[in-house]
Amino acid sequence: MTLWRSLQIAGLVAGMAGAASATEVKGVLMDKACSGKAEVRVLSTGIEGGMIVAEAHTRECALMPACQKSGYGIFTYDNKFLAFDTAGSRKALEAIKASKKLDDLEVVVTGEIKGDTIKVESLKLL
């Protein structure tokens, strides 16, 4: 094998290793405006928020103009909110409008996570 061919193969392998890979995330679809209600808070009276609040979030609320305008994201089973990119929010809105579910909008999202945002490749309501 020539030196040039070896360098090409090494470059290809290095490029593939540096490529971002898609991650599958499961949770509940919510709008950003309401996501703060689901954040877990420890109070003197007990714990508030969390997945119970996220699952109770309604389709009707998610379709309100202010909630649509805020964009969407996923509240994960480890109690974190990942905001969708603009294209992901459009996909989420289409899925919510097409769904007959009234609440508990469980979803599987595949995409690239960067910080607290996910660039959505695919989204499926369960």
Where do the model's predicted regions map?
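Bacterial N-terminal signal peptides that target proteins for export
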Residues: 1-10, 18
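Long hydrophobic alpha-helices with heptad-repeat/coiled-coil character
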Residues: 13-14, 103
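Short N-terminal leader segment in a subset of presequences, especially plant chloroplast
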Residues: 9-12, 30
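C-terminal segment of classical bacterial N-terminal signal peptides
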Residues: 15-21
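OB-fold and OB-like single-stranded nucleic-acid-recognition modules
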Residues: 21-126
